[in-house]
Amino acid sequence: MPANNPFKTALAARQAQIGLWLSMATPYLAEVSATAGFDWLLIDGEHAPNDLRSTLHALQAVAPYPVQPVVRAVAGEVPLIKQLLDIGVRSLLVPMVDTAEQARMVVSATRYPPQGIRGVGSAIARASQWSARTDYLDVADDEVCLLVQAETVTALQNLEAICAVDGIDGVFIGPADLAASMGHRGRPGHPEVQAAIEGAMRTIIASGKAAGTLTSDPALARRYLDLGCTFVATGVDVMLYANAARKLAASFREQPSDAPAADKPSAAY
């Protein structure tokens, strides 16, 4: 069968993709989220307590649904990328890519030789349906949608070079880490940070690559989409639950909850 990755196809066509961030590390909630109507779900392996096995379980949980899973690795490590691709990850987000050299290494890790250095173990891999997909090795490289995160001042300085790397399908701006890198830790909504984010998005879009980010602020999400951002995560599962639970508990108390305001959006999470 030909290479098949609906998320990659949508990004290439610049069709806006609205996503939800999954940080609870449970396949049950991943499946619930798959029924919500989002275009994509981010299974987080960087800041959420996911490992290879829990990531596999999440992929299996959402597989019956049309929503597209994207997996964020804890780092752009070659052995880990090999394992993630083997368990069936087709859309991969790699954090903290600061240079074109790093971007090229990540691309190489997602390609089989001679184009790259990915180890060949497809016969025992979920990705090939355990060899039921007899043409898997022929189409595997084309099925990968590779996204890298630019989330430091250094990355923004090198953004044009990163975008120019062949094999990078999109660049995701990480607002929280970028804010910290700019000296505004915990304040991704700071005007200087927002100006940097919007400038970076324009650079990415001008390069022909897809731009993406995360924000729980609906107005800001729409602003990014209007700028031409293609893939935007608009909420985080654990925050949605925590805020709803706190609000419900507070509604039955005489005193307002001392917890953070549930309805206050964040430019980062």
Curated annotation (Swiss-Prot):
Feature type site, description Increases basicity of active site His: 86
Q: Which GO terms describe its cellular component?
A: cytoplasm
Transmembrane parts of this sequence? none
Q: What cofactors does the UniProt entry give for this protein? A: a divalent metal cation
Record keywords: Lyase, Metal-binding, Pyruvate
Q: Which GO terms describe its biological process?
A: phenylacetate catabolic process
Sites binding a divalent metal cation sit at 151, 177
Which class of enzymes does this protein belong to?
A: lyase
Site (described: Transition state stabilizer): 72
Catalytic reactions of this protein: D-glyceraldehyde + 3-hydroxypyruvate = 2-dehydro-D-gluconate; D-glyceraldehyde + 3-hydroxypyruvate = (3R,4S,5R)-3,4,5,6-tetrahydroxy-2-oxohexanoate; D-glyceraldehyde + 3-hydroxypyruvate = 2-dehydro-D-galactonate; D-glyceraldehyde + pyruvate = 2-dehydro-3-deoxy-L-galactonate
What residues sit in the active site? 47 (proton acceptor)
Q: Which Pfam families has this protein been placed in?
A: HpcH_HpaI
Q: What is its EC number?
A: 4.1.2.-
Q: Name one GO molecular function term.
A: metal ion binding
NCBIfam families, per database record: HpaI
The UniProt function text for this chain reads: Aldolase which can catalyze in vitro the aldolisation reaction between hydroxypyruvate (HPA) or pyruvate (PA) and D-glyceraldehyde (D-GA). The condensation of hydroxypyruvate and D-glyceraldehyde produces 2-dehydro-D-gluconate as the major product, (3R,4S,5R)-3,4,5,6-tetrahydroxy-2-oxohexanoate and 2-dehydro-D-galactonate. The condensation of pyruvate and D-glyceraldehyde produces 2-dehydro-3-deoxy-L-galactonate as the major product and 2-dehydro-3-deoxy-D-gluconate.
What family does the Swiss-Prot or TrEMBL record give for this protein?
A: Belongs to the HpcH/HpaI aldolase family.
The cross-references to PANTHER family, in alphabetical order and at most eight, read:
2-KETO-3-DEOXY-L-RHAMNONATE ALDOLASE, PHOSPHOENOLPYRUVATE CARBOXYLASE FAMILY PROTEIN
What this protein is called in its record is: Hydroxypyruvate/pyruvate aldolase
Which species is listed as the source? Cupriavidus necator (strain ATCC 17699 / DSM 428 / KCTC 22496 / NCIMB 10442 / H16 / Stanier 337)
